Amino acid sequence: MAQASGLMNGKRGVIMGVANNRSIAWGIAKALAEAGAEIALTWQGDALKKRVEPLAQELGAFMAGHCDVTDLATIDAVFSALEEKWGKIDFVVHAIAFSDKDELTGRYLDTSRDNFARTMDISVYSFTAVAARADRVMNDGGSILTLTYYGAEKVMPHYNVMGVAKAALEASVRYLAVDLGNRGIRVNAISAGPIKTLAASGIGDFRYILKWNEYNAPLKRTVSIEEVGNSALYLLSDLSSGVTGEVHHVDSGYHTVGMKAVDAPDISVLKD
């Protein structure tokens, strides 16, 4: 995105949730770095660290530390590391979610209490916990961004409790936007269309969902991590200085559609 060169010069922030070079979070990290931002990345566990380290090197990013959002001490440690390195930060990207994939099939009615609580803790509460710590080290006028999905608004196959969690996450965006607005800190979410990522591998019949979106979205295609990254760049930069509490859709317009397109072919379920 050459026209964005220099847009984030002098801005510093952390991206939490990069898993590999197909992650939506990675698309965001690249867009920010190309626009001049200084980036920090986190990881969870040694396996992910091995994947994230070469990506950090590619962008010249700071490795801010291991972060398991179920352990608040690790979130504290990450923000302490950021404060020690930079003093203040300007943006945070939260790209963290989890649910037992075995409970994403079948009926939502059968969701276990344990998985419901764990899904909400990791996918929803962690955003509030991260925002609370960001508030302490963020410059006035900063920006916080999280990732959601259309399953928060409408029932989607094989999404179950994650849809409930994303709905709660979107509500959290609005409440946090009010809490932080007096400092000029903006809080928003991107609702991306389906993209082949590590997280998406846990969703059943995902190839079918991709094709359905491709055939029925107004733009007649799915979206890329680069397109999500460019939208994130807008929301994290001063270009969106008047925008907060929003869910910004990057889904080729699929969220506007009420029924199958009349010219869309009939497709059977494509097994992953």
UniProtKB/Swiss-Prot annotation:
Coiled-coil spans in chain: none
GO CC annotation: plasma membrane
GO biological process terms on file: fatty acid biosynthetic process
Entry keyword annotation includes Cell membrane: yes
Pathway(s) per entry: Lipid metabolism; fatty acid biosynthesis
Catalyzed reaction equations: a 2,3-saturated acyl-[ACP] + NAD(+) = a (2E)-enoyl-[ACP] + NADH + H(+)
Compartments where located: Cell inner membrane
Site (Involved in acyl-ACP binding): residue numbering on this chain: 207
Molecular-function annotations in GO: enoyl-[acyl-carrier-protein] reductase (NADH) activity
Annotated InterPro entries: Enoyl-ACP_Rdtase_NADH, NAD(P)-bd_dom_sf, SDR_fam
UniProt entry tagged with the keyword Cell cycle: no
TM annotation in the entry: none
Active site (catalytic residues): 149, 159
Classification via SUPFAM superfamilies: NAD(P)-binding Rossmann-fold domains
Keywords from the UniProt entry: Cell inner membrane, Cell membrane, Fatty acid biosynthesis, Fatty acid metabolism, Lipid biosynthesis, Lipid metabolism, Membrane, NAD, Oxidoreductase
Membrane topology label: Peripheral membrane protein
Gene3D superfamilies the UniProt entry points to: Enoyl acyl carrier protein reductase (1.10.8.400), NAD(P)-binding Rossmann-like Domain (3.40.50.720)
EC number: 1.3.1.9
Residues involved in NAD(+) binding: 17, 23-24, 44, 68-69, 96, 166, 195-199
Annotated family: Belongs to the short-chain dehydrogenases/reductases (SDR) family. FabI subfamily.
The protein's name in its UniProt record: Enoyl-[acyl-carrier-protein] reductase [NADH] 1
Gene: fabI1
